[in-house]
C-alpha cells in the first residue's frame, strides 16, 4: 500500500525500517552459530522480496535506514542484507551518519561502498565522548540527554560528525537526492534547533566543480 500511495503522490523513494529477526543475537552470547545468522537474513529476504518486486513494478525505490535494531546497522550487515536480496534494484539505503559514527563505523567510507545504493540522506548529528563514561554504546537503559551516556544526538554542527567530508563524498558519487534534516537534541529548544540546522545545511552544501582546479592552464 505504501508503494501505491507513493506512486499516486509522485514520490519515487520510500524511507523506512524492516526490523530484524536476528537483532537479539547481536552480542553472540549465548553462543550464536553462523547458520542462525544466515537463517535470519534468508527470513528477511523471504519477507521483503515480494514487497520489493511490487516496488519495482511501480518504479518506486525502498530506502532502508541503516540503524541499530534493523537487519542493516553497519557496513558489513548492510552489504549482507543487499546480498540476501540478490542486489534487488529497488532496494537501497537511507544514509544517516549519526547511527554509524558513535558505533565506530567509518561513515564516509559507507557512502563510497554503497555509491549506487544511497537513495536518501538524513542530515543528523551525534556526539560521542573521547573518554570513558558510565553508560556505553548500548545506552544503559537511560534516557537520551543523560550526561552519563557515551553518546547523544545533537543539533547539526554541534556533534562529532564531519559533514564536510560527507558532502564531498556525496558529490563524488553523484548523489542528487535531498538532504533531509532529522533533528534530535534533548538539551535544545526545537524551534531554535530547526532554524540553525536549516542554516547549517545551506552553508555546508555545495555543488561539485565542473572543472579541474588547474584547467586554466590547459592549451586551447
Residue ranges of predicted features:
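Active-site acidic/histidine proton-transfer and metal-coordination neighborhood
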Residues: 1-93
Amino acid at each position: 500500500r505504501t508503494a501505491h500511495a507513493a506512486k499516486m503522490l509522485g514520490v519515487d523513494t520510500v524511507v523506512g525500517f524492516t526490523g530484524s529477526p536476528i537483532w537479539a543475537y547481536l552480542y553472540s552470547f549465548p553462543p550464536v552459530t553462523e547458520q542462525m545468522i544466515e537463517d535470519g537474513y534468508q527470513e528477511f529476504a523471504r519477507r521483503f522480496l515480494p514487497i520489493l518486486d511490487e516496488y519495482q513494478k511501480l518504479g518506486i525505490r525502498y530506502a532502508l535506514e541503516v540503524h541499530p535494531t534493523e537487519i542493516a546497522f553497519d557496513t558489513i550487515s548492510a552489504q549482507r542484507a543487499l546480498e540476501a536480496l540478490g542486489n534487488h534494484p529497488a532496494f537501497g539505503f537511507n544514509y544517516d551518519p549519526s547511527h554509524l559514527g558513535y558505533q565506530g563505523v567509518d561513515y564516509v567510507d559507507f557512502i563510497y561502498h554503497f555509491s549506487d545504493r544511497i537513495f536518501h540522506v538524513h542530515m543528523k548529528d551525534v556526539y560521542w565522548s573521547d573518554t570513558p563514561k558510565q553508560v556505553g554504546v548500548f545506552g544503559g537503559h537511560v534516557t537520551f540527554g543523560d550526561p552519563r551516556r557515551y553518546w547523544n544526538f545533537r543539533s547539526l554542527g554541534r556533534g562529532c560528525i564531519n559533514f564536510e567530508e560527507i558532502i564531498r563524498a556525496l558529490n563524488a558519487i553523484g548523489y542528487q537526492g535531498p538532504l533531509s534534516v532529522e533533528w534530535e537534541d534533548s538539551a535544545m529548544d526545537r524551534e531554535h534547533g530547526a532554524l540553525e540546522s536549516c542554516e547549517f545545511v545551506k552553508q555546508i552544501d555545495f555543488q561539485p566543480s565542473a572543472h579541474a582546479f588547474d584547467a586554466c592552464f590547459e592549451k586551447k
